[in-house]
Amino acid sequence: YMSYLAKNYNRKKISFKYGRGSYLYSTKNKKYLDFVQGIAVNSLGHAHPKLVKAIKNQSKKLWHVSNAFQIPEGEKLAKSLCDKTFADYVMFQNSGAEATEAAIKVARKYFYSIGKKNKNRILCIKNSFHGRTLAAIFASGSKKMTEGFGPKVPGFDHIVFKESKPRFPKLRSKIKKNTAAIMVETILGEGGIKPIPDKCLNYLRKICNEKKILLILDEVQCGIGRSGDFFAFEKSKVKPDIVPIAKGIGGGFPIGAVLMNKKAASGMIAGTHGSTFGGNPLAMAVGNTVMNIVSRKKFLNNVKKSSKYFLLNLNKIKNQYPKIIKEI
């Protein structure tokens, strides 16, 4: 078998014909329970009837139009996101990496717009994950991700997160005069599936207020209902300035977005950022459908209920096999 795809993925020798709900069906007619879900993407499973209907209906009307014009479907989704969250404004993208890059631009442009042109550094957690684009991998601070992609993209500093010392003891010393923002994943992904404790998130907010810098909470992977709340940071009552999202908001369709409060968004005037495909009518029709379902209390309560069930029973299995399973 000759593949003409680049070798940047170590693909398993299995392919699928179709999916239904939580199941995938292979080209060899095997049924699989899909625990991967496209890596935190298929928030409503495979081929959800309402998503199929939304794509079908919108595809008959309009797929793409330039952002030089108003897009009602995008206006609707932006309003829903703002009504549900801390945000005052939304910029649509196509992926998580795009959303992260845009979040960095928003933070830097804000300070530039108020006359602080040298205030542009972003403080991140070492070995986090913010995407695969050039700035994003250097924001992540992982040698594994950045090796071979030099020269180093400047503008990023790093702190270490340890569960034993969740309050970032060296945080204050890492914030310089030219620091513009702190950017962290609310739940570390590549860093080991480690939630940032609520007290720690509140501490970050306090420090950002004190130092007059912005707080960016990356919810690309942990947001859109995965934690049982619409955003994972909601339980902490913290209000960030900027939040990049993607993955689950599209339910399998490429959608990303940056949510911003009025202050953070003030520098983003016409011409400062753009996306050819971001916010297109077809994507927005899908996003509105996902939003209508995932934002409901009943849906989120079911996530919490399912989470308790899995934690209880997975811990039972862990206790049975302590040498095999280290942590749940």
Question: What kind of region is each of these model predictions?
Answer:
Residues 1-328:
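Conserved N-terminal phosphate-binding loop of PLP-dependent enzymes in the Aspartate aminotransferase
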